[in-house]
Every structure is written in structure tokens, then in C-alpha cells.
């Protein structure tokens, strides 16, 4: 994706290989700039690591904006043809192709460790990444590794938190940040944010959960600013009410997710978060409605059917 930032003009057309975060972010921007965008994703849905409902809603929004999206599409190769590139792929067992002025490969990155270590001081590696323990110490005592160099989320804020933990440990201080609670943000329009586990992931782990959801079309500020479809979803343990995850797709989602990062990191319950009053009109009111929905007290959503 670095090369896209060096371009002096907007291409007429762009094919993006991959349907992850980087892909949908660039697709959103370039489509708004008038570029014809095509996304090719090998898995059954875009944003495959996020909540299914988010993937489905974003796909509808992007297609509405003229972006072609092909899922379960296995790319076979890219060939130059005059002043354009032909991206060949297989979809539904049929060979197809997408022609565009440029092709962006957005399927992830590998750590660059070339020349990083001396020959006689190379730590244990696994698939190009440095192996560390829970304290981020490598197989070489006193040598630590954080961020994109190790396994885990390739995010700037995750790397910063890991670095802080290492320094605090070395200084003999109590660790101040829970590095296992990592917010994920997608800068599309509308924004997307997530932390903790989804409802499906909870089921896979055998955790009994309840889910509160608020559709943001009923939010006052969303109506004022004429926002597109969006929602806030909260996942909490069924018996204790402890919040274990949250997924948001709405305006300012990347700013509002912080409330749930704090909640998940501190094992806070739904009732504890409900104690806070939320100003009106704000997007943040949607959080209160989703929390109330978990408790059966939301007044701006359709009531759930009694079991």
C-alpha cells in the first residue's frame, strides 16, 4: 500500500487483492475520489476476522457506492496488458478476470528482520517472527521484542502498549496496560470498531452470553447528521453480566470503542456501565441504548419476544 501514497493522481480503476482492513479502507477512499474499485477476497466474506453482521452491512454499503466485491474468489495471477493489468481469479469454479489501471495487493505483511540480528545472536524464530514469552522476552535473556516483529495484532497502539509493559517490568513497576485487550479499528465510512470477542466466538469457546444491540438509525445525532446504516452490539456473560466484547459500525465508532476497552480490561458489568449518564444528542447515546437492551429497558428499540 505504500506505493499508493506516492501516486500523484487518482487512477481510473483499481483492483484490490484481499478484503481485510487495509483493503476496505482504501476502497472507501478511492471510490469517493471517483476511482472504479474492485475487491477480490479469497474467503467467504470481507473483513473475515470481524463480526459477520459488520461484514454483511459494509458489503451492502460499499456495493451501493459502486464498488465491485467478489468473495470466495481465488486470485491466480496478474498480467500486464498494455496500459492496464489483468487480474485472473476463480469464483464459483469459473475462471474470471478483472482489468484495471492498477492492482493493490493487500493480503498482509511479513516482518522485515533482514540484518536485524548478528549471526551469533539470533533469537528463536517461527515463520519469520520472533518468539517471545508473556513478558515479551526472546530466547536470548535480556533481549525483548514487540509489535509487528512478533505474533499478534499488527497495530501501532498494540506495539506501544507492549513497549510500555516491557519498560514497566524492567523498572520493577506494576504493569499498567492489559496488552491482551486490543481494540481494532477500521477507518471506513461508517467507521468500524471492535474489542473482545464476538457472539460467535463466545459460542465456540462455550461461553453462555447475551447480546444487546441498538440500530443507530434511531439515534438522534445520527438522524441530524444523516448517517447511513449502523449499529452497536454488546456481548456479555449471561449470568454475571460481565462485558466480554463489543462491535460497532457507526459514526465515531473508533472514538467510542474506548469505553468498551476499559470495560473488558476491568471485567466491568452491564449494570456498572449503565450508571454513567450520556449526553444528548450524541452518538454515545447508542451505547446506553445497547446496554439497556441487554437489561430489557431500552425505549428506542423493538421489544424482544418473550421466550
For each of these PLM feature ranges, what is it?
Residues 70, 124-126, 173-183, 207-212:
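A short alpha-helix-loop-beta-strand transition element characteristic
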Amino acid at each position: 500500500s505504500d506505493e499508493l501514497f506516492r501516486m500523484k493522481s487518482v487512477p481510473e480503476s483499481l483492483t484490490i487483492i484481499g478484503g481485510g482492513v487495509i483493503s476496505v479502507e482504501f476502497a472507501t477512499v478511492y471510490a469517493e475520489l471517483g476511482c472504479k474499485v474492485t475487491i477480490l477476497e479469497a474467503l467467504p466474506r470481507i473483513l473475515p476476522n470481524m463480526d459477520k453482521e459488520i461484514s454483511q452491512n459494509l458489503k451492502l454499503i460499499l456495493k451501493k457506492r459502486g464498488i465491485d466485491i467478489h468473495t470466495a474468489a481465488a486470485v491466480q495471477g496478474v498480467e500486464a496488458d498494455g496500459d492496464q493489468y489483468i487480474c485472473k481469479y476463480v469464483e464459483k469454479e469459473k475462471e474470471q478476470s478483472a482489468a484495471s489501471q492498477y492492482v493493490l495487493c493487500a493480503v498482509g505483511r511479513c516482518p522485515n528482520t533482514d540484518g536485524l540480528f548478528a549471526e551469533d545472536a539470533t533469537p528463536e524464530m517461527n515463520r519469520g517472527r520472533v518468539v517471545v514469552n508473556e513478558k515479551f522476552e526472546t530466547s536470548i535473556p535480556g533481549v525483548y521484542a514487540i509489535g509487528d516483529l512478533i505474533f499478534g495484532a499488527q497495530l501501532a497502539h498494540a506495539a506501544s502498549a507492549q513497549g510500555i509493559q516491557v519498560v514497566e517490568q524492567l523498572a520493577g513497576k506494576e504493569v499498567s496496560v492489559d496488552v491482551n485487550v486490543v481494540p481494532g479499528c477500521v477507518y471506513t465510512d461508517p467507521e468500524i470498531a471492535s474489542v473482545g470477542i464476538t457472539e460467535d466466538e463466545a459460542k465456540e469457546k462455550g461461553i453462555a452470553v447475551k447480546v444487546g444491540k441498538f440500530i443507530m438509525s434511531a439515534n438522534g445525532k445520527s438522524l441530524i447528521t444523516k448517517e447511513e446504516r449502523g449499529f452497536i452490539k454488546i456481548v456479555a456473560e449471561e449470568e454475571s453480566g460481565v462485558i466480554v466484547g463489543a462491535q460497532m459500525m457507526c459514526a465515531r465508532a473508533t472514538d467510542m470503542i474506548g469505553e468498551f476497552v476499559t470495560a473488558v480490561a476491568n471485567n466491568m458489568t452491564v449494570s456498572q456501565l449503565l450508571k454513567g449518564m450520556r449526553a444528548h444528542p450524541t452518538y454515545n447515546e447508542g451505547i446506553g441504548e445497547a446496554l439497556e437492551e441487554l437489561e430489557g429497558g431500552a425505549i428506542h428499540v423493538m421489544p424482544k419476544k418473550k421466550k
